[in-house]
Amino acid sequence: MSQFVVCALYKFVSLPAFEALQQPLLKEMESLEIKGTLLLASEGINGTVAGSQAGIDSLLAWLDAQPGLDNIVYKLSFDDEMPFYRTKVKLKKEIVTMGVEGIDPRKVVGTYVKPKDWNKLISDPEVLLIDTRNDYEVNIGTFKNAVDPKTQTFREFPDYVKQNLDPKQHKKVAMFCTGGIRCEKSTAYLKEQGFDEVYHLEGGVLKYLEEVKPEESLWEGECFVFDNRVSVNHQLEKGQYDQCNACRLPITEEDKQSEHYVQGVSCPHCIDKLSDKQRKRFVERERQVQLAKSRGESHIGSDVKQVIEARRQDKVERKQRQHQEG
């Protein structure tokens, strides 16, 4: 068995005093040597963490003992290496960001469909199957005949619905995502918009891959995950994809052979999207990483710090552009 257990978990529940849970939860995770990130908001908890089997079991038991956090939905997978670098508990407005006020999966949500019943549902010609994940996730794997909304963030999903779906025309809609949480909100949103028969895959793609045999599966490709594994195959093992340290998108070995691929600096997906400022920053970051390697030093810590700082600056620049665009 692999050394590390990866646990994706979430629960929508009213947590009016969620801020008070941050430090006790962080302390518990650190004491159990668990890494990863958990998000807390007034609407619940969400995140993915990794550690030893005993550590994950203890964390789940600790959460189960907290008011409102019993019976958390979780999925387990395994990895030979620790897929996270740090331990974080963040306070958020939403545990999964759709950006629409008043959407509450605790009040109204679509019909849950077990993995064993999913194939029958999506094989119905009257069912419109929609992948609610981001475009770069869809690109490396999805269900057969699924519609790709081509969204770059989950915030764009409501606009996709408004522009492309009609309750009178689309009588039956089935949706899926990685672990199930995005579909909690997407189905709740569709119900609020007047759609009647709305379904979603219980436990998400990860639960489907766990329970459905490959020879019976309608899943094609690999499943993107938000950690250092990048993707997992049908056996929930680390997949064939790597990640561009500039844009964070999944890349193949073929991508690495491209003239546009420069380790740590660019890839075919982002070569035309990087500003000169970003490119210079990535070049310097990679130089520092290689310098540490040449000295025989452990470069992981400094590399991670550089990556995190680069991500932070990218977010700032992106928000500034969005503000300027109106």
Curated annotation (Swiss-Prot):
Disordered: annotated segments: 293-326
Any Gene Ontology biological process: tRNA modification
Record-annotated active site: C177
Gene3D superfamilies referenced in this protein's UniProt entry, alphabetically: 3.30.70.100, Rhodanese-like domain
MF terms in GO: oxidoreductase activity, acting on paired donors, with incorporation or reduction of molecular oxygen
E.C. numbers: 1.14.-.-
Record-linked Pfam families: Rhodanese, UPF0176_N
SMART domains in the record: RHOD
CDD domains in alphabetical order: RHOD_YceA (cd01518)
Catalytic reaction equation(s): uridine(34) in tRNA + AH2 + O2 = 5-hydroxyuridine(34) in tRNA + A + H2O
Keywords: Oxidoreductase, tRNA processing
Domain Rhodanese positions: 123-217
InterPro entries associated with the record: Rhodanese-like_dom, Rhodanese-like_dom_sf, TrhO, TRHO_N
Family listed: Belongs to the TrhO family.
Function: Catalyzes oxygen-dependent 5-hydroxyuridine (ho5U) modification at position 34 in tRNAs.
Stated name of the protein: tRNA uridine(34) hydroxylase
Lineage per the UniProt record: Bacteria, Pseudomonadati, Pseudomonadota, Gammaproteobacteria, Alteromonadales
